């Protein structure tokens, strides 16, 4: 736990101690999968296997108030994954067209593919609760109904962000790059991980999954380049675009990012690919223009300006 840079009082230091351990090194029940993932990665890297993509599913434990109340410890099933080195053939190239790196975006993409299989609404938000993750390259994973942010349920209901019958999103885990100081403890280079609580994830999954038929008509793609302040996260931009686009917006993605003198200090340019589609007909420019105008207006509310 010291190698994970966990300060005194951190929740992950609330470990379950064994009364008769086989050795001092195995005297506690693990509070996280991260240690065993890092051990496995170092084992492979030290044996000429620099490119690692591994996962583990198993129980993790927290003591809680079990000793004081003579109750059972907090045990839950967790799933974790780790990437280091070059990504294999399973991963697509980056938006720059280069081979993928084991970075935050690769781990988030892998996590997203998994969560989509659960048919769960999910989002991420910047987080600093895990000292073993790289500051600025770490996020909390939220899953479930409602607004994707750390806002209390009463506030959500009062502001209308939480519709009737919806639940506030649950924090189910983290995703990010391992802090360089922590990775160095295991003799690893750039490394990305995620870990989620499978029990919380199952509770957040949609109880009913609706079938969406395959589209029989082509989509209409339009690209936008928008300049935004650096603090505005791409995930926030995509969320606002989806809301503004309405039913005719089939998909949106970021395919380029630019920072430099042309956009000014503290700003960056995001290039967005917008895909419009209707289920029963081929859309025209006149059909998509209202949705595009709403998207431009929504980006303006975030402080964005279109680049020509």
State each model region's role:
Residues 54-60, 252-255:
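A structural supersecondary motif
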Residues 1-52, 222, 275-277, 283, ...:
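Extended, well-folded interaction surfaces typified by the phenylalanyl-tRNA synthetase beta subunit core
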Residues 44, 48, 62-64, 68:
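Mobile "lid/hinge" segments at catalytic clefts and subdomain interfaces of large enzymes
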Residues 81:
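Conserved catalytic motifs of ABC-family nucleotide-binding domains
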Residues 4, 74-75, 88-308:
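A carboxyl-terminal module marker
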Residues 47-55, 119-126:
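Acidic/polar loop patches that form or flank catalytic/metal-binding clefts of enzymes
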Residues 34-38, 42, 58, 76, ...:
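Predominant activation on well-ordered alpha-helical scaffold segments within soluble catalytic domains
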């Amino acid at each position: 736990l010291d190698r994970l840079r966990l300060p005194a009082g951190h929740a992950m230091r609330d470990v379950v101690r064994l009364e008769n351990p086989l050795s001092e090194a195995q005297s506690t029940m693990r509070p996280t999968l991260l240690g065993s993932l890092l051990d496995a990665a170092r084992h492979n890297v030290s044996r000429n296997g620099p490119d690692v993509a591994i996962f583990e599913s198993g129980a993790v434990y927290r003591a809680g108030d079990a000793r004081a109340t003579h109750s059972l410890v907090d045990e839950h099933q967790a799933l974790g994954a780790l990437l280091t080195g070059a990504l294999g053939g399973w991963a697509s190239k980056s938006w720059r067209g280069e081979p993928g790196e084991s970075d935050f975006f690769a781990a988030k993409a892998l996590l997203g593919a998994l969560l989509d299989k659960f048919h769960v609404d999910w989002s991420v938000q910047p987080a600093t609760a895990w000292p073993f993750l790289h500051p600025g390259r770490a996020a909390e994973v939220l899953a479930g109904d409602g607004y994707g942010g750390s806002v209390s349920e009463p506030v959500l209901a009062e502001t209308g962000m939480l519709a009737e019958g919806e639940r506030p999103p649950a924090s189910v885990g983290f995703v990010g790059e391992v802090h360089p100081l922590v990775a160095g403890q295991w003799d690893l280079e750039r490394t990305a991980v995620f870990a989620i609580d499978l029990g919380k994830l199952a509770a957040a999954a949609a109880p009913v999954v609706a079938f969406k038929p395959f589209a029989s008509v082509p989509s209409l793609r339009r690209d936008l380049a928008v300049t935004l302040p650096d603090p505005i996260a791409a995930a926030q931009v995509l969320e606002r675009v989806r809301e503004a686009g309405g039913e005719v917006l089939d998909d949106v993605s970021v395919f380029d990012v630019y920072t430099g003198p042309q956009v000014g200090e503290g700003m960056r340019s995001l290039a967005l690919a917008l895909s419009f589609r209707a289920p029963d007909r081929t859309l025209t420019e006149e059909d998509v223009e209202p949705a595009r105008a709403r998207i431009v207006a929504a980006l303006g509310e975030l402080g964005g300006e279109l680049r020509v």
